Amino acid sequence: LKKQMSIKRGQDWGQNGPLPADGVVVHNNAELQKLVEDCRLGNQELPTEGLPGGDLWRTLGGTKQQSRLQTAEAQHLKIDVGSVLVDGKIHWFVAHAVARKSWWRGQVWLAANAAHLGNWNLAPRAHPGDGLLDVISGNLPLGQRIKARSRLVSGTHLPHPGLTVRRVAAMQVTLAPGTSLWLDGQPVGEARDLSVRLEPEALHVVI
């Protein structure tokens, strides 16, 4: 495998080489999140995952050519994984945890390991290999939400005086009653007390 990419000055991040024979191809956020959570709950080793789609794949600059995963040009990367204790029950996520009542009203809280949520560059500084979660929270008036939404694709909604941004390895938060939680786009249900932390380099992916 040939080393390439750098996350910090003077430090290599990633290697080149095809997806191994025992690797698993996961096509979207839901498949990846379920695989990680099932392995963690079953105390099983995580397989190497090939990514032809999803928010983590988009953040890493992957291509839509799934055949690339079998070539020497494919990139191997060690990725951080998030875990969240939700009212006493543990879950895992790879791209993002989002807590909200609505995108249009009330408090919005998110912990991002990946920059993208769909077409939105929601957390433009988030990097899934830097050991930190980008935690963004705020409760903007409707007019400001409309303006911010128009900038989400480009990531220029930040910085914003009404949004708080923190970069942390772990944190705890208490949500307002009636707030729902999504992990990698999958609904978990209503949540009140969250304890979030990052597991550095817990996942081996190929793009």
Indicate where each model-derived feature is located.
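Internal helical hairpin/lid segments
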Residues: 103-148
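Short, low-complexity, polar/charged sequence segments that are solvent-exposed and flexible
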Residues: 68, 98-103, 113-115, 127-132, ...
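A short, structural micro-pattern
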Residues: 76-78, 103, 127-130, 165-167, ...
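Short low-complexity stretches enriched in small and charged residues
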Residues: 87-96, 125-130, 154-164
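Exposed beta-strand and adjacent loop surfaces of beta-rich binding modules
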Residues: 79-81, 132, 178-180
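Catalytic core of DAGKc-family lipid kinases
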Residues: 1-116, 122, 167
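ATP/nucleoside-binding phosphotransfer catalytic cores, i.e., glycine-rich phosphate-binding loops
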Residues: 137-207
